[in-house]
Amino acid sequence: MSQWEKVYGVHAVEALLRHHPKRVKQLWLAEGRHDPRVQVLTELAAGFRIPVGQRDRRELDEWAEGVHQGVVAEVSPSQVWGENMLEELLERSEGVPLLLALDGVTDPHNLGACLRTADAAGVQAVIVPKDKSATLNATVRKVACGAAEVIPLVAVTNLARTLEKLQQRGLWVVGTAGEADKTLYQLDLKGPTVLVMGAEGKGMRRLTREHCDFLARLPMAGSVSSLNVSVATGVCLFEILRQRTPLE
């Protein structure tokens, strides 16, 4: 499987089969697994004439980098968008633009969780710096539960410069910082927005911070001083979604 990427887990593989079936070369299932969730996968694979085989679970354990749920797919290399594609993504997106920029999130579990939350909140693209980010690997895909197959991940050479270009296009850049004067709930986030989240502990880099139009913090009522970056991202994104959702 060395020349192919591997994707594992029911949700991640199902998302691939539904959204990018041409990328899937082979579907492997653990011997003896015939439950309804696997039946859905085999039916999808059959519809696209994708071979389905069985392997001993211990062999799948060696292939996968984590809990595979008895499902592993061999796929062609994943697409990471370049910064020149941001304009196209914004042009074809519907509604008020909402982008997420992750400055220095290097843990694949955090990146996967952020992708999952971003998709749920309606984010059009997630932006990461090429040299300060986890890569789109099998662990990220598994944690993202299918979101990595549908939400564009844009890797940029210079995050500060990219934020400046987005500002010129009319987007407001909102960065998160624990020492900010205002809380996130005091900002009007209904307009075109880029939400910037920094790395745990270090926060945003200096140049990234300098390119933010606003800085905001999450109010903390307990004894801990901060949240996990993926949890904080979820809180921030769903506050933006709340502000943009009309009351019925």
Swiss-Prot record:
Name of the protein in its database record: 23S rRNA (guanosine-2'-O-)-methyltransferase RlmB
Organism: Pseudomonas aeruginosa (strain ATCC 15692 / DSM 22644 / CIP 104116 / JCM 14847 / LMG 12228 / 1C / PRS 101 / PAO1)
Top-level taxon of origin: Bacteria
Binding site for S-adenosyl-L-methionine: 198, 218, 227
Pfam families, per the entry: SpoU_methylase, SpoU_sub_bind
EC number(s) reported in the record: 2.1.1.185
Entry annotated with the keyword rRNA processing: yes
HAMAP family named among the record's database cross-references: 23SrRNA_methyltr_B (MF_01887)
Leader sequence segment: none
Xref: SMART domains: SpoU_sub_bind
Top enzyme class: transferase
